[in-house]
Amino acid sequence: MVLEGNPEVGSPRTSDLQHRGNKGSCVLSSPGEDAQPGEEPIKYGELIVLGCCEEGGEETEAQRGEVTGPRAHSCYNGCLASGDKGRRRSRLALSRRSHANGVKPDVMHHISTPLVSKALSNRGQHSISYTLSRSHSVIVEYTHDSDTDMFQIGRSTENMIDFVVTDTSPGGGAAEGPSAQSTISRYACRILCDRRPPYTARIYAAGFDASSNIFLGERAAKWRTPDGLMDGLTTNGVLVMHPAGGFSEDSAPGVWREISVCGNVYTLRDSRSAQQRGKLVENESNVLQDGSLIDLCGATLLWRTPAGLLRAPTLKQLEAQRQEANAARPQCPVGLSTLAFPSPARGRTAPDKQQPWVYVRCGHVHGYHGWGCRRERGPQERECPLCRLVGPYVPLWLGQEAGLCLDPGPPSHAFAPCGHVCSEKTARYWAQTPLPHGTHAFHAACPFCGAWLTGEHGCVRLIFQGPLD
C-alpha cells in the first residue's frame, strides 16, 4: 500500500511514490526464518578490500626509489597493519540478520526547503532528501522491508556503518600528513540482500546517517525520472564493474559504471564529481555478481559470493603450494644459496635471508645481493647478471588473500614492481583490470598491496634456477 503524503510537513502537493517490491505495510520476519541457536547464519557474500594498507606501513625499495638492502614490505596482504578489528577490517562477511532491517521507498513529498529539518525530525523514519533549489525540496520516505537486510559501508565509525573503510592510496601506501583528506564518503553506499533464495545482493549509492537520512544538496547531481520519481548521484560517486564471464579462469574485465542513489546504472561522468550524469544503461542492473568491483573513490572492494569462494583456493592450499615450492629447493643462480618463501606466520618485518628476489623486467629469481646497481639509470635500477636487463629488483611475497585469486594454480607469476606472487591467470586478470584513480584516471594495480603496475604486461613469469622452472 502506497501511503498519501502528510500535509503537516508543509507540503503544497504530494505525489504517490511508485516502487518495486511487495505492497503492504511493515511486516515482521516470519517465525522460523532465522538461524536457530548453534546454526551458522546464511552468508550472502564477502567484501574484500583491494590493497588494504594503513598508516605506518613502510614503502618497498621500488616505491621509495632506493636500493639499500632488505627492508620491510609496505602491504599487509590480506590483513590490516593493526589487525582486523571490529568493523574496520580487510574483509567482511555479510550474513542474514536475526531481524530484517531493509527499507524500501514509500511516499514522496514536495515541501519548502526551510521546512526540511522539521520534516526529517523522526529518527526512526528513513528518508532521502533532494534539494532542488533554496525554496523547493523533495523528500522520499522509506518504510521497513521485511524481505531484505541492509548493510552500510563508509568512512564513518558511527554505529549505523557495518563496514568502516579508509583510503588506500596509490602505490600501496596510506594517505599521510595533516593535509591528507579522505575522498571516501562517510556514508558511501548500502547493499540490500534478499533474505530468501537466491539471496540476491543489490548495491545503492549513499548510506543513511545517524538520523536515518540521506541528503543530496543543491549542488549534487539529481533529476526527476520519466515516471515522476527522483534519483541522484553522490559527490564522488560509487562505481561498479562486473567481470565478463564471472570471476573464474576465463574472466575478463568488464566496463565501469556508476550506481545511483536508487540503484540505477549509468555510464561514467566526465569527471568523478561532475554535475552532469552519464547515460542510463537500461540492460544492466545493480545486482552484485561474483567478482564485482565496487569503487568508493579512495578504496576498491571485491564482492565474492559463497559459490565463488568455494572455487577459490583455501589458505591451506596456498600453504601447501608454498611448501611444495620450497621443497623443490630453488637456488640463486649466482650465489648458489637455497631460496625459500617465508611462512606467513613469521610476519612481514623484513625479507628473510633465504627470501627469493626477482628482477621484474626479466623474471629471473635470485637471492638478495647488494651489487649490480645502475645509479646512472636511477637508484632503484639493477642489472640482471643473467640477461643484463636493467630494472627494479624486489623481494617475492606469496599473495595470502585467497579471495583475490581466480584459480588455485601454482604461484608462477609476480606483479611488477611489488613482487607479489600468484597464479598466471590471476596475475594476468588483475594486470588487465583498470582500477579508478583520482577524478577520471584508471590504472591497473596489484590487488594484494595496491601498487600501480608497471612494464608492458604488469606482471612477469618467474624463472627459477632448478626443478621449479
From Swiss-Prot:
Location of the region described as Disordered in the Swiss-Prot/TrEMBL record: 1-39
Enzyme type, top EC level: transferase
S-adenosyl-L-methionine is among the record's keywords: no
Residues found modified as Phosphoserine: S11
UniProt pathway annotation: Protein modification; protein ubiquitination
Post-translation changes: Phosphorylated by IRAK1 enhancing its E3 ligase activity.
Keyword NAD among record annotations: no
GO term, biological process aspect, one: innate immune response
Catalytic activity: S-ubiquitinyl-[E2 ubiquitin-conjugating enzyme]-L-cysteine + [acceptor protein]-L-lysine = [E2 ubiquitin-conjugating enzyme]-L-cysteine + N(6)-ubiquitinyl-[acceptor protein]-L-lysine
EC number: 2.3.2.27
Gene Ontology CC, one term: cytosol
Tissues where this protein is expressed: Highly expressed in brain, heart and testis, and at lower level in kidney, liver, lung, placenta, small intestine, spleen and stomach. Isoform 1 is not expressed in lung.
GO MF annotation, one: ubiquitin protein ligase activity
InterPro entries: Pellino_fam, Pellino_FHA, Pellino_RING
Transmembrane stretches, start-end: none
Keywords: Immunity, Innate immunity, Phosphoprotein, Transferase, Ubl conjugation pathway
Protein function: E3 ubiquitin ligase catalyzing the covalent attachment of ubiquitin moieties onto substrate proteins. Involved in the TLR and IL-1 signaling pathways via interaction with the complex containing IRAK kinases and TRAF6. Mediates 'Lys-63'-linked polyubiquitination of IRAK1. Can activate AP1/JUN and ELK1. Acts as a regulator of innate immunity by mediating 'Lys-63'-linked polyubiquitination of RIPK2 downstream of NOD1 and NOD2, thereby transforming RIPK2 into a scaffolding protein for downstream effectors, ultimately leading to activation of the NF-kappa-B and MAP kinases signaling.
Subunit structure: Interacts with TRAF6, MAP3K14 and MAP3K7.
Family, as annotated: Belongs to the pellino family.
Protein name, entry field: E3 ubiquitin-protein ligase pellino homolog 3
